[in-house]
From Swiss-Prot:
Name of the protein in its database record: Regulatory protein E2
Segments of this protein annotated with the region Disordered: 226-309
GO CC terms of this entry: host cell nucleus
Biased composition (Low complexity): 226-235
Tree of life domain: Viruses
GO annotation, biological process: DNA replication; DNA-templated transcription; regulation of DNA replication; viral DNA genome replication
Amino acid sequence: METLAKRLDACQEQLLELYEEDSKHLEKHVQHWKCLRIEAALLFKAREMGYAQVGHQIVPALEISRAKAHVAIEIQLALETLLQSTFGTEPWTLQETSYEMWHAEPKKCLKKQGRTVEVVFDGNPENAMHYTAWTFIYVQTLDGTWCKVYGHVCYAGLYYIVDNMKQFYCNFKNEAKKYGVTGQWEVHDGTQVIVSPASISSTTTTEAEVSSSGLTELVQTTDLYNTTPTPTTITRSNCDPDGTDGILYKDPTPTTPPRKRYRQSLQPPTKHLQHYGVTNVPVDPGSQRVTSDNNNNQRRNPCGNQTTPVIHLQGDPNCLKCLRWRLKKNCSHLFTQVSSTWHLTEKDYTRDSKDGIITIHYYNEEQRDKFLSTVKLPPGIKSCIGYMSMLQFM
């Protein structure tokens, strides 16, 4: 009993010294787990001999000591092989080699530089869960060698790549079954938001072909009229175990406001926006898009070759400002220029209404038609088509 107590005291004293040292050398952490293994073995032996207490130490049950010893042996052996690899000279903290880190997803791997990824289910910010994505993951292959890989985030989940194979350690589809109802979710990774292209195209988005690359770009309509500066730059997240790509939005970088301002000649203000020399084209209130007239004269340029097709959009100034921002970021290939927000005034220079107006210019009618068939305008935005001249003054 006395010998057992002395050995246990010496082991625990060494553990305290290691904790106080807080070393970043992997050799010290190997020694730490070796001490934990010896401590568990001594307590197991004491319990096996019938002791309930050794000194001031309460002796746990046999199964508890056995389980702790198995964990200590496993991690000690892993750290010893890591120490012999090229990553053994890297700085390692006690936390990075802890039991909690070893058994955190992905399990039985070493991880560094974790960050929080928020997943919002069913579009409800109140129904969100947090997950840990790792910047670096140290994986031991089947032949016992260690490799250092990057952790990745996509719409499907969290994963890393080893031997050209994606290994998912968190599947958001399974999480959506537990926490969601509709089976839809959004992934918020810092300033990036990844959403499902299937959910976008079936609800509030349309597809726009990118002529330069032949790729397809999805534009989320809700972002087109959201009054807060939400992420707008779109790229594809081509990683999904179920074959569903995600759409990645990044926060836009601040851009300088347009310097050139100009006035446009319009008829006196009425309830509906009118164009110089052009009759109004009705707007379908259900789709919020300009409807084409069957009369070919409406599609003919009435002012000669020095005019350009335009669309006037009228609505809340703040909504128009955000719409213009998102059009320039996401659909700049579908028009040539877009004006700043302007207003109609009465003869006494008072505003006719609080609504603002922006004007979008196009190379030709074909480009304008493509814009109309691609971009869905926000609710509350009135639109009508027409032609304008004197572009040389812009």
